[in-house]
Swiss-Prot record:
This is UvrABC system protein C. GO terms for molecular function: DNA binding; excinuclease ABC activity. PROSITE patterns: GIY_YIG, UVR, UVRC. Belongs to the UvrC family. InterPro entries: GIY-YIG_endonuc, GIY-YIG_endonuc_sf, GIY-YIG_UvrC_Cho, Hlx-hairpin-Hlx_DNA-bd_motif, RuvA_2-like, UVR_dom, UVR_dom_sf, UvrABC_protein_C. The UvrABC repair system catalyzes the recognition and processing of DNA lesions. UvrC both incises the 5' and 3' sides of the lesion. The N-terminal half is responsible for the 3' incision and the C-terminal half is responsible for the 5' incision. Residues 660-672 have a biased composition (Polar residues). The keyword Cytoplasm applies. It comes from Streptomyces avermitilis (strain ATCC 31267 / DSM 46492 / JCM 5070 / NBRC 14893 / NCIMB 12804 / NRRL 8165 / MA-4680). Keywords: Cytoplasm, DNA damage, DNA excision, DNA repair, Excision nuclease, SOS response. GO terms for biological process: nucleotide-excision repair; SOS response. HAMAP family: UvrC. The gene is uvrC. Residues 208-243 form the UVR domain. NCBIfam families: PRK00558.1-5, uvrC.
Amino acid sequence: MADPSSYRPKPGEIPDSPGVYKFRDEHHRVIYVGKAKSLRQRLASYFQDLAGLHPRTRTMVTTAASVEWTVVSTEVEALQLEYSWIKEYDPRFNVKYRDDKSYPYLAVTMNEEFPRVQVMRGHKRKGVRYFGPYGHAWAIRDTVDLLLRVFPVRTCSAGVFKNAARTGRPCLLGYIGKCSAPCVERVSAEEHRELAEEFCDFMAGRTGTYIRRLERQMTDAAEEMEYEKAARLRDDIGALKKAMEKNAVVLADATDADLIAVAEDELEAAVQIFHVRGGRVRGQRGWVTDKVEAVTTADLVEHALQQLYGEETGDSVPKEVLVPALPDPVEPVQEWLTGRRGSIVSLRIPQRGDKKSLMETVQRNAQQSLALHKTKRASDLTTRSRALEEIAEALDLDSAPLRIECYDISHLQGDDVVASMVVFEDGLQRKSEYRRFQIKSFEGQDDVRSMHEVITRRFRRYLSEKERTGEWADGDLKDGELKDDEGRPKRFAYPPQLVVVDGGQPQVAAAKRALDELGIDDIAVCGLAKRLEEVWLPDDGDPVVLPRTSEGLYLLQRVRDEAHRFAITYQRTKRAKRFRASPLDDVAGLGETRKQALIKHFGSVKKLRSATIDQICEVPGIGRKTAETIAVAFAQAAPAVPAVNTATGEIMEDEEPGTTAGSSQEPVSAGTSDERRGQET
């Protein structure tokens, strides 16, 4: 650990101005970012007697090896720069709110030609309207099912939409009146967009307009003795009112507001947020954070505001934000929120009435969330600590393996050979660190050779990052190598304490040999064989057998199974893309537009394959020479292998070229977040 006096700035060096500062460790990584109204006063507080510092602040300043700062002109600029640096560098000692879960939103993709209503999680996309968050996805689906009677907006995926447009037949929702079926041109793109905008208006809280309009239409229909139409409108009104009843009125003035409450103890804090729109609670979410330094409730509120609104603009930032304590000073934060919204935002503490009552409800939720988290964490932490200790004891390690990486190879009879790397830190999944590999050095089936290649590539990258971050002495750097002074976390910068491979002695030996060839001797290696669940170590003829009730064995099984799942998912994706390749892809000069025209004309690749040259010439834009080239391409191609849904075993029909299960136009299901994070190497 460093002595803070060794890098303390000289007297007079630190300006007495607003600014943002960064602490870096000995490897030049940014470990803490903060802002201050006066840099001189704030930084001086870190270099006082260590005994007087908060324990976690003391750990931070002794871990750091240098400090630097950037002067800004206003406190609002300091707030913006602090947020952007925290997002960029991900400093380990900054307050980080951990979502209790990935909350689902009701999303309307207004950025598409035919907007779609769907459930979405994760990062927000530009051009998409979001409503929520909701506690459960089923709550969104119940609401949408009711509203589709009145606002029959498209809900199908891009693949289903294209297939319906190609065949001229809508999906089931189009037949039962819960979709306006723009895919078969029952309504125009403009009419469908108007429906989507009305859907968004209703979800935004402007409900009275539509209820009154439908009531007038129902009355007019009844007066004209159009009783079936009147009955249908009556049912539509009932559906809208039922959807509204799901969110009781909590604020009589029908305001838009977010209420933030904080419950805390010496080590942790829980934040709860209620999103109120049109006087009704439209969503709720909660976070928990470790208090890495001596922070006040006002500081926690400020961090929560940054987390909530750092990426939001316009109406996503409400007119009113109610908090238990105001940031000090409050003016820069309020000015920043106003800038995000584009109009004045009121940031205040509720004093009386229904807003104070609702704030008390939010506060109770925060207290219950903190109590539940501490109970669960105490149990989980004890179990995880015992599992890591058992692994360390069984493998004769010097300390518990806080970072474990597991590798698995997946292929189908030697085709589409891929590998996965999954990471567990402190016994928990670290999905942002997952990686995927394609085996490049050879073709065919050889798990041992594949394992050697993957381990070599991963740890060669680690050694490269080690050089770039300056972790080796300057004299060890190669000519022309530049040290990376940005301090951002790198993809392969952190080594594990334990490498686990899915397999027995051959795979373990291959992994160990790869590390030895790179000169790495401080990383333990083991393998977990299937069926008997035996743990294999390098150079040991007999496996280590852990008790079946061992928490350590259970953790190793979880790690191994996760690596297997991640690898086989990637392998299936690659296989599906290969199966869906078309001979049309090899026809020179045949662009996407004419491919689509061919598929639309014949209905499928299978029918196109059996067509004559004269029949192909009937397609607009296809001349005889091109038709002959297409016929030759199909004649030379091997018989098409049918694509199979690996989950159900169902043989899938031909689709138009370029459409795959992983198309960027398809929404990714909530259960595959780690596949989205994984990066192909």
